[in-house]
A protein has these predicted regions:
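Active-site bordering "gate/hinge" segments
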Residues: 3-185
């Protein structure tokens, strides 16, 4: 399939494997699109390499930086987003709140967006989480929050905040994105 680049670390590939196999649960027959830019190219490359181990229906797109979060990607990128079922966005600026992302989601794409992701945070930061454990923990917290009107968060280091939930919508964003139209950020 794909020959690995020498500068991609094992830690980056391990995290990419988690994104591809656990978070997105990519299947062999799926079309996968990885969108990156010059500032996040190392991360995009590692995601491409790992996805290429699962499917040969993969495309890596390097787009110019958008200069600010929420700015629409170039038209060719937006067009190709609508044609893929699995989209990984590893760019400096967020594409989460763009019409291109919304349209792709509406048409059934599942999308993982990682705005601002860099090599260090990809290798050693939150992306290295155990997503199966995280999914269970967040699901349990969602049940708790749905039943409470008042929430208090405190810690030994001095955190002490309380707020009313007011019947707000509970979003269980646990990093797992395995259904059409789903997005994880």
């Amino acid at each position: 399939m794909y020959k690995r680049q020498d500068d991609t670390s094992e830690a980056m590939l391990s995290t990419a494997r988690s994104v591809i196999r656990t978070c997105l649960q990519v299947r062999r027959e799926e079309d996968v699109l990885v969108i990156t830019d010059p500032e996040t190219a190392e991360v995009g490359q590692s995601l491409y390499e790992e996805a290429a181990r699962v499917t040969d229906r993969i495309l890596l797109v390097m787009m110019p930086p958008t200069q600010r979060p929420g700015k629409e990607p170039p038209l060719p990128v937006a067009d190709i987003m609508r044609k893929n079922r699995v989209i990984i966005i590893a760019t400096k600026d967020s594409l989460t709140h763009t019409r291109a992302r919304q349209q792709a989601t509406k048409e059934g794409a599942r999308i993982v967006s990682m705005p601002g992701i860099g090599r260090i945070s990809f290798e050693t930061g939150g992306m290295t989480a155990d997503y199966n454990a995280l999914q269970k923990e967040i699901s349990a917290m969602g049940v708790l929050f749905r039943r409470k009107r008042r929430v208090r968060v405190s810690s030994p280091s001095g955190t002490d905040i309380d707020f009313l939930t007011g019947g707000r919508w509970v979003l269980e964003d646990n990093g797992v994105c395995n259904r059409p139209g789903q997005i994880a950020n």
